[in-house]
Amino acid sequence: ELFILVDEDSASASEVVAGAVQDNDRGLIIGRRTFGKGLVQQQMPLGQGDQVRLTTARYYTPTGRSIQRPYDTSSRTDYYAEVRKRHQTGEMNDPSKIPINDSLIFTTPKGKKVYGGGGITPDIYVSTQETKDELWNDYIIGSNLIDLFVFLELDKNVKNFNFDNKQKFLNEELPNPNGFIESFAEFCKKNNLPIKVTKKNKENILNSIKAFIALQVYDENTYFKIANQNDKFVIRAMETD
């Protein structure tokens, strides 16, 4: 069976694919409501090196849903802040908070209801279920800060690792995990992005560090083997019959 994993950062082409799969009953969409970016723009020259991009079309799913969310009643700032507002309304933790327009409910060939109004609403919802501190930690882990930390740590302490056996690296935990946590917390503090380490997120931090080590030493495939172990979306897909 086909599962497509999406969240609020999924935009444009990924939404076209997710919408087509959902509308044709070919698979399940797992995650959270997507960004809602479905405009077609054409770049036109004005002369002297100047150019302007004109919106010439919109992307629609097979049932007729417009992927683009409304923007005509909001300012540019409000438009890009809409995803942040989903945290305020509770949508990130509760799918019942997703705004539904009754006039924009569509039906697939097999009778499943799908929803328009901007973005792709998933079939199976994955809640953030996170506090503000946890969301902040996720932001840091998702930034390039952890990648830089791993690069510097490997440069200084590569002698502490044995990378000859990839499978052994995958199966074993990092050497001196507490030392890694302390070093990363100090590194974040020096970069003015303090991270709060708790029992709950310690495993995620170590897993992310290990994944980025694998990316720099081995390859992208090994990175994802490690990173996906704690990925809520992947776990939910694996649990789905």
Where in this protein do the model-derived segments appear?
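Soluble periplasmic/extracytoplasmic beta-strand elements of cell-envelope proteins
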Residues: 1-7, 20, 28-30, 51-58, ...
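Cleft-lining beta-strand/loop regions that shape enzyme active-site pockets
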Residues: 1-49
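Hydrophobic alpha-helical scaffolding
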Residues: 3-11, 30-33, 45, 57, ...
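Solvent-exposed loop/turn segments at secondary-structure junctions
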Residues: 8-12, 34-37, 59-62, 74, ...
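Active-site lining segments that contact anionic ligands and/or coordinate catalytic metals
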Residues: 24, 49-54, 101-103, 121
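Generic hydrophobic-segment detector
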Residues: 26-28, 39, 54, 100-101, ...
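Short acidic-hydrophobic surface loop/beta-edge motif
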Residues: 42-46, 58-59, 104-108
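Conserved functional hotspot residues or short segments at active or partner-binding sites
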Residues: 66-67, 71-241
